[in-house]
Amino acid sequence: MSSSFVYKSLFLVPILAVVAMQLSFVQSVLSLNQTNEYLHHLCLNRQGTYESGSKYARDLNNLIQMISISILGDVVVFSGDNSIYVKLQCRGDSSTSTCRSCLDTAFSGVSRRCLNNKGRIIWYDNCVLTISNISYVWRDRLPEQFLYFNAKDVSGDAKSFNEKTRTLLYKLKEKASSKENIPNKKNYLYATGEESLGKMKLYAMVQCTQDLSIKNCNVCLNWILGKLPKCCNDKQGGRFLSTSCNFRYELYLFVKLTTI
């Protein structure tokens, strides 16, 4: 997919280190086109930098190692005088090993791209990693977003395709942000689905980070889905990602479909 508009805003993250992640039990599927492609990053320069070998650097490295070891749960750690917040969100169909691998890749990747920045965000197919030392409200981070869309337009009835794409994504939004979708149950704040398009199929997913409430997940998804027409109308595939929620749709199977 070719990238399009990138929106940036430097509102930033809490004084604790937390991992919010989701690993769901999923059914096996065939012909799954699954990658861990690098997507985008932001270096949050207003948060300043730190020196290699400093206490901050040691605390951050130790925290990343702790998160990797404790990948199945939430982690809260103070970092002495240098409060650090780390949020890792893996895609809902990620296994523990896939999530751990994505954390390693993301930390290495953002360390190269944002050398010694205290504030940085990086997106991959399988995870998003946020590192910061400043308190934030999740709504303030909504402008930290970007989108991709397929350069190819759909053939045939584009209006019908757009309507079916919108209907499927909003259906998944309702499923992901349902009050019945309580914490500690599979597929919390995450949903996948498919829709028949004649001889083809449309596949889609939506997800919120698990530091959001169900109500705020619904708000976040409504906000980014409102960008769907401008983002992706008539396109064979598209995705819109923020630090708190995202959606994606394609005409090929890119995600393991969740069981009902």
From Swiss-Prot:
The record's InterPro entries line, in alphabetical order, gives:
CRR_secretory_protein, GNK2, GNK2_sf
Domain named Gnk2-homologous is located at 38-136, 142-254
Q: Where in the cell is it found?
A: Secreted
Q: Which GO terms describe its cellular component?
A: extracellular region
Which positions carry the signal peptide feature in this UniProt record? 1-31
KW Secreted (keyword) present: yes
Record has Secreted as a keyword: yes
Keyword vocabulary terms for this entry: Repeat, Secreted, Signal
* Lineage: superkingdom: Eukaryota
Q: Which family does it belong to?
A: Belongs to the cysteine-rich repeat secretory protein family.
Q: Which PANTHER family match?
A: CYSTEINE-RICH REPEAT SECRETORY PROTEIN 29-RELATED (PTHR32411:SF54), CYSTEINE-RICH REPEAT SECRETORY PROTEIN 38-RELATED (PTHR32411)
Name by which UniProt lists this protein: Putative cysteine-rich repeat secretory protein 23
